[in-house]
């Protein structure tokens, strides 16, 4: 361990060894962020810090596990297991369980996942007899999530006129009522959702300064990974813990801030010096992942952003091939070309299938790629009909989201917390007990009337007046007896493995699947056996840790807080298809960015503000920097939307990449697209192949240098014939067409009046909308009608 500093480059070493105040480490793509975090902890341990005094917060269990394993190799398991290291949610769930009584919860509160929360929202909407299309459960839950992340309680929400007006404008005037009822039902059920874990930690620290002081003194230093992804609630918790000792080590990259739709706020990292005036900034600028061309191309794109911490990444890897850019007539042609390109490169360069990734903006775009990859009619490099290309959709049905696993987990939750209505509703009639939906609705109505959980109604003499026949009452009594017996059994053992086996056995889950011996049910039984094995492994791991807890409650906390990245365990040798958002933090030898068109990059919803455009540019930057060796960007003149071909323009970000680092490949004719319907050409063009410096290649057309990138887009669109995107009269406009005081009608924001016109390089207008308030619109992107 003595020579650990020798494994760091000078910039990494400076960041690790500095101990004179708060730090921000700007870690560019591929610059060794995890290594720096790991060695910072080692350095702290070497300089007198006790393991329990170090709080390290990550966004995924995978990241925390990787860091802990690296630390274990250097200092041993005994020290590594004493660190407070984990995701924001897992660490603060732990703190909340210790202090649950302060906030009106029991220590064994249930943690709802997105499925549970959505299910509860659906029940509330149905009970209120609201239009389920107008009040889409996922949209309602997202609204509530954003409010919690901004620390707005239901009461705060109801008295904020801006929110009420927004809800009325979106024809959802009952949002405040739904939020309040959701909040109350969670408390009755003794449950918290993911956002509550952060919300209630803030409440705990605000209302109980003695508890806050305890943790301020307990944690002598706080390390945070991916600081650019923090939301208001997370940022505030970190500040409360670190504001006295100012010992904070924040690592992140503002250029990779792409999660504002989840509540992440880039200003948390950009304005960290305001929180910590003595903050020292370190920059990790050497990219160990990508070739020089990919690194410099990405630099040339992201430097167009105005809101950023300046940095200049470099690479000492080989120069590599230029980024290839290719246009197609349709996304159908585009998808089949990508399939054949991947096939050709794999055959020529001996890559594995999992060395390739195809990235896109939205999940809906994967359909046409799946068709191209699945088709057995496409041609190989010799013009012969090829077999389908193996692929996987990243983020498919994860283990803990499979029905049989969720059924078992619902039983676990009910044993731990019988007031958990979502769990009870899921299993009260599974396996079938002749307890129908009408009975459940009657029980829920009584629960609502008496402010109880459904279990609370079941345990009351006379069921709070619910009228049921004798047969149904007998079935309910059997169910109550089963759960009560399992609850008593759980109180007698602290071993999750034993309880998981017993619950699965006593509930009848295995039996009902085994009775119908189909291949699907055999697989489901195997999944339940895997669940038992995972509980056994959990207990084994906990016993190896000093003070480790092996209870069912602790196992369920571990299960509940698995993140999206942690759930993806498919390591099959296949091409990965995924959104750019899902790709963050990953890397592949070869990356194709599919559908690089305006309205995808940037998305339609992001075009109305400079902040939105800059986040979309960061998204393209993230896509490019996933590539280690080769990157190709494709786009089509027409793409398919709802089964119809719609005209499309290239993403303006393509033109913003310095032409020195890109190579445009000429558009092939219709018959050259090795599609199932075309004749074999007998020749394959490897678009990833490195160019000879002496070869003359087509170059990207560059606008005059006096124009900024946004002006390029304005000029380009001003001379582009109207397409489907401007149908209905909504289109972009130039400064010459507008004046202050002019009324307009915007696609999203409705009616408004122009208050100010910025004639600087941004060509921005400020509009006061009747229902949406004041907005900044970029003329190169915003579509509206002049009234």
Task: Locate predicted features.
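Conserved helicase C-terminal RecA-like lobe
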Residues: 168, 366-378, 387-388, 402, ...
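Conserved P-loop NTPase-based nucleic-acid remodeling module centered on helicase motor cores
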Residues: 53-58, 62-142, 152-156, 326, ...
